């Protein structure tokens, strides 16, 4: 029988914090592309100074790899948006397994949810399905509808071939790396008006 092409199929592993080493099931869903352990390790090293007590928003939660990792590292809370019903149900089960009472799963299309007036978050994860043109629309909805706190950090994962995404003028590129065909970047937001105060 042919083995899967990638190891760890069907589960994610939390790599740091209070739930370090815990493995959690992930449904087999087309297009589900959990952020790799290596990329997550780099990202959460970047976020280490600010993750504790942060309010986090995971716009395309999928496996929950980013939101659950943030909670494991003592984020104050997390909202995980996931459109696929089966995937969102598994996220709810995984949160219950971890006894994570400081998180909620929103079973919704991210664009529809983010089009509403939001509450400010300190850290936002934007890791949309590739090749669907969702990235820049998501970025604009976050900025325009109040989802971002002053000085929020926004993690963006995208295809290398697309180059730098267009971001609001008050976002600055803080960190950037490439892993294979995936570019991952961390942006820092300034409150509107601060960048004009020089």
From Swiss-Prot:
InterPro entries: DNA_methylase_N6_adenine_CS, RNA_MeTrfase_RsmD, SAM-dependent_MTases_sf. Keywords: Methyltransferase, rRNA processing, S-adenosyl-L-methionine, Transferase. The keyword Transferase applies. The keyword rRNA processing applies. It holds the Pfam family Cons_hypoth95. It comes from the Bacteria. Its EC number is 2.1.1.171. One of its GO terms (biological process) is rRNA base methylation. GO terms for molecular function: 16S rRNA (guanine(966)-N(2))-methyltransferase activity; nucleic acid binding. It catalyses: guanosine(966) in 16S rRNA + S-adenosyl-L-methionine = N(2)-methylguanosine(966) in 16S rRNA + S-adenosyl-L-homocysteine + H(+). CDD domains: AdoMet_MTases. Belongs to the methyltransferase superfamily. RsmD family. Specifically methylates the guanine in position 966 of 16S rRNA in the assembled 30S particle. This is Ribosomal RNA small subunit methyltransferase D. It comes from Escherichia coli (strain K12).
